[in-house]
Amino acid sequence: MITIAQRCSSAKVSVNKTIVSEIKSGLLLLVGVQIGDKQIDIKKTVDKISNLRIFDDEKGKMNLSILDTKGSLLVVSQFTLCGDIKKGRRPSFVNAESPSLSLKIYENLMENFRQLGIKTLGGVFGEMMKVELVNEGPATFIINSKEL
């Protein structure tokens, strides 16, 4: 599982010009589910993101986690993160999990965050979405569950 975590002061997802999810302070997570991702990948990703100290404390030092700040998550499925661009000029998505399995893993990921008490909203799986955010910092992190 590949996740791009972007610290934000606000983020929202729209489908057909209608806002479907919106958060204030927290993280926008773009998530790509790869073939072979399992419950352990979800656990590692949730563990890392929920405890990652990437929010400023009162001294301006990155020292607080999403749990500490009581921030929100906006989780958006993005299979293009699994794209392979090594050969040719068009990405190959053979490493992306099937839509049906990806949906289950995506929903499970969000539920795991909710079980920790983190307000977690999502995009609309499989839909063409417009994602907007105000990136704070900017602070953007790449998390690959296979490297944790």
What are these regions (language model features)?
Residues 1-89, 104-148:
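N-terminal, polar/charged subdomain of small-to-medium soluble alpha/beta proteins
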Residues 86-98:
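A charged helix-plus-loop insertion that forms the helical arch/lid used to bind
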Residues 101:
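Acidic/glycine-rich phosphate/pyrophosphate-binding loops and surrounding catalytic core
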